[in-house]
């Protein structure tokens, strides 16, 4: 089986035999291009122009023939036949998906296909697990170190798909009371793109739900500085409003902010980590309620004392 990894720096092997130098050779990049466009035949002349567009048609086609010869030679050296994977004729070239192969990009997209139109709070447990498997495959941007124009578009598309999937998992964990895990996914998103203001807002709310209002405010200031330094803008009105609500204690307390229409899970189906996290959240909430109740009682006592003094 041919196994190709295009995320990160990339590598390829035929069974246990690595293909040395992959993908940093023009012939290997042609193979990468065919893999990324595996569902379509590629016109030979157009394919040649993608890689050798600065040359005449005759010269670019010659370079393409040389690349195919190089691929055939490399495949033979690891015990594979190029004809099992590439359909080559005078007019076109195509990757044969009928051959035995495994491609990380293809698996990644297939795992995410069923949840593409779902929001994070709409995911069930199996769908969330599928999404986690897909994200585990993404250990770096597509073909890092390759700056060809054809690669940049695919890199951006797959990066957005990856980041949006992380955001869905962040929301999924919030909606299932797993706030710490939600924060971990938020940190992973910001590691790729720390200017995502919606993620900073989500993290502010997750800290609040954990009973850590000071960390929620710190997250806002972190967001504010990043946007100012890297983009030259201030946080938008939604983020500022959320900050002001939290700063002046007008934001709903954890018990009020989370409302779920889902039925309560059977305790037998809740793992220990989830149950522990929920219990910690409840403790934080009860402590806050006690503090607020004490403050209210002190106000009432002060009013009663004032009324008593006036009546004397």
Question: Over which residues does each language-model region extend?
Answer:
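Short boundary/linker motifs that mark transitions into or out of structured domains
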Residues: 1-30, 84-92, 104, 140, ...
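Short amphipathic alpha-helical recognition elements used for nucleic-acid or partner binding
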Residues: 20-51, 71, 198-200
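DNA-recognition element of transcription regulators
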Residues: 23-32, 57-79
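Conserved amphipathic alpha-helical interaction elements at protein-protein interfaces in regulatory
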Residues: 36-37, 53, 77, 229
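Ca2+-coordinating acidic residues in Ca2+-binding motifs
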Residues: 46, 63, 107
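Intrinsically disordered, charged and Pro/Gly-enriched terminal/linker segments
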Residues: 56-57, 92-312
